[in-house]
Design a protein with these regions (language model features):
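A solvent-exposed, acidic/Ser-Thr-rich amphipathic alpha-helical stretch
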Residues: 23-77
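A general structural-boundary detector
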Residues: 13, 39, 91-92
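Hydrophobic alpha-helical core bundles mediating ligand binding, dimerization, or RNAP-core interactions
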Residues: 9, 13-16, 30, 56-59, ...
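Hydrophobic pocket/interface hotspot
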Residues: 12, 25-27, 34, 48, ...
Length: 146
């Protein structure tokens, strides 16, 4: 059971290793009532698979590619924990941004993501981009209606 949930998370993360998101595949990997909190605790929770896809699409307007290097994965029950190094290349200036991320995923019995939380240092990213913490907060504020 745990291996299948971990595999579902690995497959889900692999969908983001691209310049153009396949929103149909992302939506299929999510439970209809899934939730996503892109930056715990600062960003608002995004509710629903369609809203999550819209928010992911919005974020992909900022960068042109993404790579999630999975360092560690573990699970307990329906929860999968990941330790990653994420790299994105910004559209504006072609700058590469690298950050350490702890992702926590709740996975249902159908191996779909029902709750996705990401923990990373927003100020580290702000420093790499060259913006203030407040500007970074505004950039990461989820833009979808809840």
């Amino acid at each position: 059971m745990a291996i299948k949930k971990e595999a579902a998370v690995k497959q889900f993360l692999a969908l983001f290793h691209t310049a153009a998101l396949d929103l149909a595949k992302i939506r299929a990997a999510l439970a209809p009532d899934a939730r996503w909190q892109p930056v715990v605790p600062l960003a608002n929770v995004v509710y629903g698979a369609d809203a999550i896809c819209r928010e992911a699409e919005r974020q992909y307007r900022i960068y042109k590619d993404c790579d999630c290097e999975l360092l560690n994965i573990a699970s307990a029950g329906d929860t999968v924990f990941t330790e990653r190094v994420d790299r994105v290349r910004l559209l504006d200036g072609d700058k590469e941004i690298i950050t350490n991320v702890a992702g926590v995923f709740t996975v249902d019995d159908d191996n779909r993501i029902v709750f996705w939380r990401e923990y990373w240092d927003m100020l580290d990213i702000a420093d790499q981009i060259g913006v203030s913490g407040e500007t970074m907060r505004e950039m990461m504020d989820t833009q979808v209606e809840v």
